Amino acid sequence: MQNDGTFDPEASYDAVLVGAGIMSATLAALLHELDPQLRLLLVERLEAPALESSAAVNNAGTGHAANCELNYTPMQPNGRVATDKAVAINAAFERSLEFWGSLLERGRLTSTDFLHRAAHISAVWSPANIAFLRQRFEQLKDIPAFAEMRWTEDRQDLAEWMPLVMEGRDPNQAVAATRIERGTDVDFGALTRAYLLPLQSSGALTVQYGTEVSNLKRLRRPNMTEGDWRVITKGPSGRREVRAPFVFLGAGGGALPLLQRSGIPEGDDFAGFPVSGLWLVCNDADLAEQQRAKVYGKAAVGAPPMSVPHLDTRWMDGRRSLLFGPFAGFSSKFLKQGSLLDLPASVRPTNLLPMLQVGATNIELVRYLINQLRQTPDQRFDALRDFLPTARQDDWSLSVAGQRVQIIKRSKEGGRLQLGTEVVAASDGSLAALLGASPGASTAVTIMLEVLQRCFPERLASADWQARLKALLPSFYSDPKSDPDVLKGMRERSDGLLGLSR
């Protein structure tokens, strides 16, 4: 507000995006490509972008394409694995690659430093898990997206694929693995910063760091633009009011409290269940250089998706790193740099019963988290030694990962713990929030396209936006899941533009 009590037009934007992580940055990039005249405001409570779940060390998994993450293909009672989710996630990641390739082609991204080749391997070593992996392989290899998947139980192949995993292992232990060579690691923190820089330089995007949204309210007075949101922020310069016809809540775990404050009825169905994580990080750079793949195992019964054990080659701050985990834990914070009061403050009359029902019907998850919380450093290291038999404790240190807030959703059948992500949008499309976790960042482009479809349907149906989308995402009006030729064309284009074919 201005000193005379009137509203400052300069504090009016076409869209306000909350949270400077990969989701808001992706949406900002998409909106700018579709309409370069839009005035966008990004608000971030921390002092820089991508410091929460988008940061490399905080992300539970990077480069998700369902190549090796076994929790995306659960075993069914009929003895076959479900493949629909894996196919959908793979197609979503291909869409992300397609988008990055277009931005690089247009000069919006100036390098591919955020993207690295890393083979994706699934590895197991118990008879039951080997049988599961074999069934998974037999089904996936016939699907075009996974046609290049290889299987082996040969010790020489295994030693070539994952030398650290096989070194020092009992020669009598049965081990099986699948491998897809065309895998990647993505530094989503670096990508977030790469998205934001040209948008800020062009003047299309204003970013306010150290600024928190304290409240948001719908304006419907006659002298206001119908439906504008009044967003109250607190930052270095004090309290400020901004207005916009569209608000996106992409603040990770912080999105749920803001969704509740918005007052839209669509938010009444949701609660959050926070899960924290820990990594063992390798301090030996030479050892990290020997691991050229992401190696995923199989999660324990009842474990949440972010706790699938894996030995992860990951680029952090421009250099190759090696992580193992994540180990699950519990904290009532919704953000790594949040408050212990986040969970209790989110309880409402509409979500209390669903939360209690989820606790009562997910005993295995509760038991798993309790056991994880009770783990000693030696027990965590024993889990690492199961993957790396020759690991030395002095080479590894404990690091805190990011917070994940799993969705609890009210339904006719009661409260349900919902894994994955969900876009919650106001009925008129004026506000959208992203809740949940995994696979998250890797599928950000597809998720933000859903936001556009639900919140900008008329503009998305216009000839202008359709032409722009077709140029930006040549396969947008095709389906790579059902058309192998479309998938092949997408991959050839993306690999060429992004340098993944080398």
Curated annotation (Swiss-Prot):
The keyword Translocase does not apply. Keywords: FAD, Flavoprotein, Oxidoreductase, Tricarboxylic acid cycle. GO terms for molecular function: 2-hydroxyglutarate dehydrogenase activity; L-malate dehydrogenase (quinone) activity. InterPro entries: FAD/NAD-bd_sf, MQO. One of its GO terms (biological process) is tricarboxylic acid cycle. It catalyses: (S)-malate + a quinone = a quinol + oxaloacetate. Its EC number is 1.1.5.4. Its cofactor is FAD. The keyword Nucleotide-binding does not apply. It is an enzyme of class 1 (oxidoreductase). This is Probable malate:quinone oxidoreductase. It comes from Synechococcus sp. (strain CC9902).
